[in-house]
């Protein structure tokens, strides 16, 4: 059976293939091999530039350009050649080394062939390649995350003034505005995004057990830590000086945990919007030709938010597992991280699919102002809070208890609440303010806070 979207095992490459195409260049096998080639070429270039490594002659401008082109012009056909070599070597990184030696054969770079992968352990190449994948994958996700936050912020400002009955423990609570509740989400998303932005991926280039053993055996006078740092930082990464054979993956765990927190905020938002749709606070625009149920023709379901919720759960399951697992490796290393790291794109893929599903759902939402107003008008008991607060202010006896007796577990209307206020011996200004108050106007600073989105 040939491979295409219909025969793919994973829905990321099947049903949802058009939802995250940007990640293919990053997290595919091609993406990994491409970055291995980049790391190997960058290391060779640094060795050629090191004056004390006399056997690795300096590069001419033409040679430097040719070496860099191997990495920058790396194609899917090149990646296939690496995989063909791997069939013989049964070693993925060694296959990259042999591929590069093939590429420079017959050129002036060939005489530097034995300095390809010089003094490196495979993990020197792999950890930097994975770090580059995460750096590039993070850019893709951050763009989508910012689009999400901007969309919610725009909605928050548009509906900053629209009053809404809040619900705590699923029960009517003090009113707020639609915009302010959306603004809360933007603040939460931005905080977690800032944590993601703060993280620069660590990397190592220090040999088989992290001590530069092989490096010093060949060139004992070279400052290998400095040279290693130069290569790592030239690729936008941060040097981890203290490692075993592997870079400890704590930085990856931190990044995945940060993505999990951001995802959890979005998942919480998906569920809230789902609830508001079910309560009638939002309506969903119908799209001609779409069907909500195979048997109930009237249905318009919040499927985009449900899809997002499911994919966020999958993303966090993968990223959360990886964050826990990757921090653990036996002694100087075991190979359990290798197969685990091949699934980085799965967590990123489900996250991107989820974000785009939520954005699609938000694009269909319409505010149901009439339904919001109805719910507020049915719940005048929420004004028990301001009334008892003013009663406390003027020193009246048992204000909380009196309002509790009037309102708890029962429906009250405007007439009942206003008759209660009329009978209170309150100062004129306080009484007038309470008499004017309605559930729709009892929103505190919600409108102002909404504009912080």
Where are these regions (language model features)?
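Glycine-rich cofactor/substrate-binding loops
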Residues: 1-34, 86-90, 280-282, 293-453
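A helix-coil-helix interface module used to build multimeric assemblies
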Residues: 2-215, 219-230, 292, 305-307, ...
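Generic, well-ordered alpha-helical scaffold segments in large soluble proteins
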Residues: 42-47, 99, 103, 151, ...
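Conserved catalytic cysteine-centered active-site region
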Residues: 103-109, 228, 232-249
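Short amphipathic alpha-helical segments with heptad-repeat character
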Residues: 135-142, 146, 153, 183-186, ...
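Alpha-helical coiled-coil oligomerization motifs
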Residues: 153, 157-160, 201, 274, ...
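Glycine-rich anion/phosphate-binding loop at the beta-strand->alpha-helix junction
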Residues: 192, 238, 244-330
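A structural signal for small-residue-enriched, beta-sheet-centric alpha/beta enzyme cores
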Residues: 216-219, 234, 239-246, 372-380, ...
């Amino acid at each position: 059976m040939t491979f295409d979207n219909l025969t793919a095992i994973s829905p990321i490459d099947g049903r949802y293939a058009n939802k995250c195409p940007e990640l293919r260049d990053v997290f595919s096998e091609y993406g990994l091999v491409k970055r291995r080639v980049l790391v190997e070429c960058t290391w060779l270039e640094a060795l050629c530039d090191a004056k004390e490594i006399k056997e690795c002659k300096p590069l001419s401008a033409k040679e430097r350009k040719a070496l860099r082109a191997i990495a920058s012009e790396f194609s899917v056909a090149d990646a296939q050649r690496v995989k063909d070599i791997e069939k013989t070597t049964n070693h993925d990184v060694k296959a990259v080394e042999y591929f590069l030696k093939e590429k420079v054969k017959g050129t002036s770079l060939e005489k530097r062939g034995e300095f390809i992968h010089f003094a490196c352990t495979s993990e020197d190449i792999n950890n930097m390649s994975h770090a580059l994948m995460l750096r590039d994958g993070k850019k893709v996700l951050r763009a989508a995350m910012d689009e999400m936050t901007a969309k919610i912020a725009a909605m928050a400002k548009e509906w900053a003034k629209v009053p809404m009955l809040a619900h705590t423990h699923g029960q009517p609570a003090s009113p707020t505005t639609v915009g302010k509740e959306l603004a809360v989400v933007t603040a939460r998303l931005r905080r977690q995004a800032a944590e993601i932005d703060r993280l620069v991926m660590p990397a190592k280039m220090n040999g088989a057990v992290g001590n530069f053993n092989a490096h010093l055996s060949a060139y004992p006078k070279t400052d290998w830590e400095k040279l290693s740092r130069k290569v790592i930082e030239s690729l936008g990464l941060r040097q981890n000086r203290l490692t075993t054979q592997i870079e400890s993956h704590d930085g990856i765990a931190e990044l995945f945990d940060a993505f999990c927190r951001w995802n959890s905020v979005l998942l919480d938002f998906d569920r809230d919007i789902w609830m508001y749709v079910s309560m009638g606070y939002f309506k969903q625009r119908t799209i001609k030709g779409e069907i909500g149920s195979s048997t109930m023709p009237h249905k318009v379901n919040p499927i985009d938010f449900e899809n997002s919720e499911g994919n966020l759960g999958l993303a966090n399951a993968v990223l959360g597992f990886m964050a826990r697992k990757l921090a653990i490796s036996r002694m100087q290393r075991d190979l359990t991280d290798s197969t685990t790291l091949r699934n980085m794109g799965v967590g990123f893929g489900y996250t991107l699919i989820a974000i785009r599903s939520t954005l699609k759902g938000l694009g269909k939402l319409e505010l149901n102002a009439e339904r919001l107003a109805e719910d507020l008008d049915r719940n005048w008991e929420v004004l028990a809070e301001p009334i008892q607060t003013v009663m406390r202010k003027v020193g009246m006896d048992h204000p909380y208890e009196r309002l509790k007796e009037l309102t708890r577990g029962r429906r009250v209307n405007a007439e009942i609440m206003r008759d209660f206020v009329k009978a209170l011996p309150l100062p004129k200004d306080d009484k007038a303010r309470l008499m004017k108050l309605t559930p729709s106007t009892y929103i505190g600073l919600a409108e102002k806070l909404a504009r912080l989105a």
